[in-house]
A protein has these predicted regions:
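A detector of single, family-specific signature residues
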Residues: 1-193
Length: 193
């Protein structure tokens, strides 16, 4: 949405008259209109987000999710909205499959393709967990960043290895989310159990 707004502003500016522009020109009126529309949409989005946070802040699952590094209010709301009750998944592998983060290999006869993410699950949930993982590895010290650093330690410049590391972090984020909700305990850094 922001990209579209910026693209519209850019196109308006590109087709407008160069400086100096008369204060009552059509180009300036159009620019102000687009800018006002963008500000209005941002204000509406903020109101919706604030209301959603106010409604869910007392929910125990919401509080548990926000204890995980990288998961803020919007990511927690998205996870709860897209996944529903995570306790319905008996094992974290079922939740990974629901997210589309399970590994799949294409096979036919004797041919065996590469193993990669199936991506058959919920794309919004997968994207949210991916973004939460990105934020978590940017924070100071936590198990997500530690795993990412270990993963790319062999070759820091290898983009393919980085992409695999990001996928591994997103899958770890999904497992952590499932475990925390299932057991009802807040996130504990570097706890493997």
């Amino acid at each position: 949405a922001k990209e579209r707004l910026l693209a519209d502003i850019y196109e308006t500016a590109k087709s407008s008259v160069g400086l100096p522009v008369a204060p009552d020109s059509d180009a300036l009126r159009m620019f102000r209109l687009v800018l006002g529309e963008g500000r209005s949409l941002i204000a509406q989005r903020n109101q919706i987000e604030d209301r959603a946070v106010a409604l869910l802040k007392d929910l125990p699952d919401y509080q548990l999710l926000t204890s995980i590094p990288g998961i803020g209010p919007i990511n927690a709301l998205t996870i709860l909205a897209e996944a529903g009750d995570l306790r319905r998944f008996g094992h974290h592998r079922q939740f990974l499959k629901f997210c589309g983060m399970d590994l799949a290999t294409i096979q036919s006869g004797t041919f065996r393709g590469q193993t990669k993410l199936s991506k058959y699950g919920n794309a919004r949930l997968r994207r949210t967990l991916w973004m939460a993982g990105q934020v978590a590895i940017l924070q100071r010290t936590n198990s997500f960043r530690d795993k990412f650093e270990r993963y790319i330690a062999k070759d820091r410049q290898n983009t393919h290895l980085r992409r695999k590391a990001y996928s591994a972090i997103a899958a770890k984020m999904a497992r952590t989310v499932h475990g925390i909700i299932k057991h009802g305990e807040p996130y504990r850094p570097f706890f493997e159990g």
